[in-house]
UniProtKB/Swiss-Prot annotation:
Its EC number is 2.5.1.145. Coiled coil: none annotated. The keyword Iron does not apply. The keyword Transport does not apply. PROSITE patterns: LGT (PS01311). Belongs to the Lgt family. This is Phosphatidylglycerol--prolipoprotein diacylglyceryl transferase. The chain crosses the membrane at residues 10-30, 54-74, 90-110, 116-136, 169-189, 197-217, 231-251. A 1,2-diacyl-sn-glycero-3-phospho-(1'-sn-glycerol) binds at residue 137. GO terms for cellular component: plasma membrane. GO terms for biological process: lipoprotein biosynthetic process. GO terms for molecular function: phosphatidylglycerol-prolipoprotein diacylglyceryl transferase activity. It comes from Chromohalobacter salexigens (strain ATCC BAA-138 / DSM 3043 / CIP 106854 / NCIMB 13768 / 1H11). It holds the Pfam family LGT.
Length: 267
């Protein structure tokens, strides 16, 4: 077994002003997405400066949707007892699935403003999202969040405050799968023009498969436990409609046009 790295969650402290690693990871993800998005802006048919506007929409969607999603999916009883708890962002967490819904709403608003097809925009955004997912999982790891289940694998970590047993470093698994692998696959697939909706469908399907798999070694949320069959978690349940939507999008995309503003400009 390995000892959990002793990393101070506070990256920078200047008097009462503190910057946490978790917050910095969000910044890293957004800045990385902004930089790569500007490099591919011509594919979307917008000016590079518009990517900053897209980032603003996306950031609002992630933060608002992530918090609302966490409250509804993982803390509904507490929300019902104290509706103002949803504003206590330091107490609780963020939900990827809620953040995804928030980003989709933000994408719809941005697409309307810039007169873009909705799935044309989501295909552009999908390869950028793993940067934020991977950075966020590193933030979870530094904060000792999302511990794995007890195991005896050689790389098991002893989590602070959870007893002497070794546990799966589940945030690192998710970093590798949802961050690194998804980015490489989506970036490579999207390097050539694809039919509208195909990249979005592949994103949903990959995330659903990876998240469903990692949930088997990740400790269930204490306030929920297993929600069915003595093994199904809320995270797994929420990935099922994602997988179905991903498959449906990939099938639907076969009848859609190829999206690339550079090709359209040349015709």
């Amino acid at each position: 077994m390995l000892t959990y790295p002793d990393i101070d969650p506070v990256a920078i402290a200047l008097g009462p002003f503190k910057v946490h690693w978790y917050g910095l990871m969000y910044v890293v993800g957004f800045v990385g997405a902004w930089w790569l998005g500007r490099r591919r802006a011509d594919r979307l048919g917008v000016q590079p400066d518009a990517i900053g506007d897209l980032l603003f929409y996306g950031a609002l969607g992630v933060v608002l949707g992530g918090r609302v999603g966490y409250a509804l999916f993982y803390g509904f009883e507490r929300l019902a007892a104290d509706p103002l708890w949803i504003f206590q962002v330091w107490d609780g967490g963020m939900s990827f699935h809620g953040g995804l819904i928030g980003v989709l709403i933000a994408a719809w608003l941005f697409a309307r403003k810039h007169r873009l097809a909705f799935f044309q925009l989501t295909d552009f955004v999908a390869p950028l999202v793993p940067l934020g997912l991977g950075a966020g999982r590193i933030g979870n790891f530094i904060n000792h969040e999302l511990p794995g289940r007890v195991t005896d694998v050689p790389w098991a970590l002893v989590y602070p405050g959870l007893g002497p047993e070794g546990r799966h470093p589940s945030p690192l698994y998710e970093f590798a799968l949802e961050g690194v692998v998804m980015f490489v696959v989506l970036w490579w697939v999207s390097s050539r023009p694809r039919r509208r909706g195909m990249i979005s469908g592949l994103f949903l399907l990959l995330y659903a498969v990876f998240r469903f798999s990692v949930e088997f070694v990740r400790r269930p949320d204490p306030q929920l436990g297993f929600i069915a069959f003595d093994w199904l978690t809320m995270g797994q349940l929420l990935t099922v409609p994602m997988a179905l939507a991903g498959i449906a999008l990939c099938v639907w995309s076969r009848r859609q046009p190829v999206d690339d503003a550079r090709m359209q400009a040349a015709t």
